[in-house]
Regions:
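Post-HEXXH active-site segment of zinc metalloproteases
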Residues: 80-84, 88, 100-136
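Fold-level signature of zinc-dependent metallopeptidase catalytic domains
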Residues: 2-25
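Pan-zinc metallopeptidase signature
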Residues: 148, 153-220
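Short pre-active-site segment immediately N-terminal to the catalytic Zn-binding motif
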Residues: 72-91, 146-149
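Short, His- and charge-rich active-site/binding loops that engage polyanionic ligands
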Residues: 59-76, 120-122, 128-133
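Flexible glycine/proline-enriched surface loops and loop-helix/loop-strand junctions
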Residues: 139-147
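Active-site-flanking alpha-helical
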Residues: 95-103, 162
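Auxiliary, metal-adjacent structural segments of Zn-dependent hydrolase domains
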Residues: 18-73
Length: 220
């Protein structure tokens, strides 16, 4: 991109950028699709570029930060997300989408293992975590969100699912001395076997904060 083109790029409104989530995220989506296919999980989330990471509550829509779309945007944002870190977050958010699409959070066993899905998120959860607990897996923990699984039952599920889905996690070995965390991982393994090959029950979409609605320019 030459200097003139770059200056024009900086003054372009984000909503006017031509971003293609499938094209930009192709190598990561390829890996994720294979991991899901290996377990015959039929859901493919509704990915889109938005303001930040997140799965819209009780939908299959997952927002990916728009600045991950191109090298130029990543450089401006100062983003240094590595490939494996990207996969960790994608697995986590996909865990939310699967929870919602198959309504797993409504099942008695899910509630007994992870807790009340309708529990309100509280600010400052880090002041209440048990840093020595072996009841929770550690996943986004290593990406700057310490003890994230302790934040809320839905996050506990998503973190546990993400480790289970990672073909290189060796969760049955890594967590063999963490009985409560291992119980959660074993539950994920069991419930995913149950929904294997089954169509999702719920495929509501909601692309909140989609990049095409962002009025700011790239430089802003």
């Amino acid at each position: 991109m030459d200097e003139i083109s770059y200056q024009k790029f900086l003054t372009t409104k984000i909503r006017d950028l031509e971003l293609d989530v499938d094209e930009s995220m192709a190598p990561f989506f390829k890996r994720l699709k294979k991991e899901l296919k290996d377990h015959r999980i039929l859901l493919w989330p509704d990915f889109y570029f938005g303001n930040e990471w997140g799965c819209e509550n009780k939908t299959i829509s997952i927002s990916i930060p728009f600045f991950l779309a191109t090298p130029e945007l990543k450089t401006l944002e100062g983003d240094e997300t590595k490939n494996e870190e990207m996969m960790k977050i994608l697995r986590h958010e996909t865990g939310h989408a699967i929870n919602y699409s198959y309504k797993l959070w409504q099942q008695k066993d899910w509630k007994e293992i992870f807790g009340d899905f309708n529990k309100k998120y509280r600010k400052g959860y880090l002041y209440r975590v048990n840093p020595w607990s072996k009841s929770y897996v550690r996943h986004l923990h290593y990406l700057g969100d310490p003890h994230y699984a302790q934040k809320h039952p839905d996050e506990d599920w998503a973190e546990t699912f993400a480790i289970w889905l990672d073909p290189r996690s060796h969760w049955d070995v890594k967590y063999r001395n963490w009985p409560n965390a291992l119980e959660k991982l074993s539950y994920v393994d069991r419930i995913m076997e149950e929904i294997s090959g089954r169509e999702p029950l719920h495929t509501k979409r909601k692309q909140d904060g989609i990049y095409s609605m962002i009025e700011e320019t790239v430089s802003e």
